Amino acid sequence: MNLDVPYYRLGNHEKVEYIPLKLALNDDTASEPQQFSEPVHKMPINDMVGYDNTTSNVSAGIIILISVVAFIALFLLLYVIYYFVILREQQQYSDSIDTDSPFVFNKFD
């Protein structure tokens, strides 16, 4: 069974009927009478007694801790790159030669 349809047969001659969104939705609530005069609570008032803000305090503390750790890690990474890459590539020249050092080659010749 072949379901391929050539593009010339998929023309746009079919008319699409639709309802404009402005007419489909009724946003005029001011003209309608209100059925509920009192506010509707989604959570009973008795259940809200045990609610406190500790979870947001803990999450704020975790965010601060993670940001401090990330800052320290970034600082250490930049210091390691500076120390092992940038400082090691610079050639260090000395104007004076230490002849008393035992590491000088051919000292005893």
UniProtKB/Swiss-Prot annotation:
Topology relative to the membrane: Single-pass membrane protein
Sequence intervals crossing the membrane: 61-81
Subcellular location: Host membrane; Virion
Superkingdom of the organism of origin: Viruses
GO cellular component terms listed in the entry, alphabetical order: host cell membrane; membrane; virion component
Statement: the UniProt record of this protein carries the keyword Transmembrane helix: yes
Record key words, sorted: Host membrane, Membrane, Transmembrane, Transmembrane helix, Virion
Protein's job: Plays an essential role in budded virus production and occlusion body formation.
Name of the protein in question: Protein AC78
UniProt source species: Autographa californica nuclear polyhedrosis virus
Lineage of producing organism: Viruses, Viruses incertae sedis, Naldaviricetes, Lefavirales, Baculoviridae
Gene behind the chain: AC78
